[in-house]
Amino acid sequence: MKNILTALLCMTFAITAAAQKSDSLLLKEIASLKRQIENQRHTHDQIIKKVDDLMWHKMLEDIAFVDKVRLTGPPRWKAKNENDRFAKNPLQFYTYVFIPKDVKKGEKYPLIVLPHSGIHADFSTYYAHIVRELIAQGYVVVSAEYRGSTGYGRDTYENIDYGGLENEDVMVSRNYMLENYSIVDKERVAIIGWSHGGMISLMNILRYPNQFKCAFAGVPVSDLANRLASHDPSYTAYFTAPHHIGKSIKEDPEEYKRRSPSAYAHLLDRPLLIHTNTNDNDVYVEEVLLMIDSLKAHNKKFDYKVFQDAAGGHGFDRIDSKESTDIRFTIHKFLERYMNPPKPFRNEADMRKAAYRF
């Protein structure tokens, strides 16, 4: 009887050990499959990006030269691991360049720096009509696919530095244009953007005021503490990911503060226009009002408008309705005051014709 019990006990241990080993292998296989799926998603994004690049040429072929160049920005803000021997290598990223086809030799043209929106996104033909509006007035446009952008594979995606060195990438694109295109007027450079691009506009005009004539920030991400507190907890995962900050805002509040435009409100020294919308379901109006109130608290002079339940929510002045394009016209008029473009729009009808051809 004793031998039987001993045998049963040994069998139980063996089965348990086998089950644990089986569970361990299963977890490894699940992790491997998950990574393969994520890699396929990045491959899909790369294909979509190549198609969209073709669309850029098609949508602007009548008025602009479209180019895409590769630049280098600062190294990652932190090494991927302690044994990364290439941690100090500058990061490579792509940048779009749009130049009016009717530029004249020997003349100077104003430059618009236009960073794209999205925590992980890219400069897509979503902005085609806006770029057409700018080109039609004689602006040169540059748009950086800063670190963290989609369409360039997993490495670029995981190089994200939200509110950090992505701003330097955008500055690199600005400097590239001034250094390499003699047609660009270094005295007439503005930065504009929406949502996350609006955040980058704020960060650059506040931290590097001498590099820009003016700025527009549409529905800009402005305060990470407010944003994380008011959004779904899953949003936090973008920041706590090991390849990004790797800590929550409770663990390192100063790290999140340095990535928030509201922390630099006291530095404003250039003309600025801010737009927000009360029914914005992404960058809530309360977050933008924090930025506006911070600027007011420091007695800064700037322009802003709070739109009341404008159709389109977060994208209210980027969609194609007449209401939306009429609002964009006011943005162009703000830029015109400081940038003196060669061919400013006389009215909203001229602007719509430039963007939509009719």
Task: Name the predicted role of every residue range.
Residues 2-7:
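Sec-dependent signal peptide recognition
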Residues 10, 59-62, 86-88, 205, ...:
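Sterically constrained small-residue positions within well-ordered secondary structures
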Residues 10-18:
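Hydrophobic h-region of N-terminal signal peptides that target proteins for export
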Residues 18-72, 353-358:
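N-terminal targeting or regulatory segments adjacent to alpha/beta-hydrolase or S9 domains
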Residues 54-87, 97, 336-358:
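Extracellular/periplasmic ectodomains of large secreted or surface enzymes and adhesion receptors
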Residues 65-93, 98-187, 194, 229:
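Cap/lid segment of the alpha/beta-hydrolase catalytic domain
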Residues 75, 146-358:
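Active-site-proximal cap/loop segments of hydrolase catalytic domains
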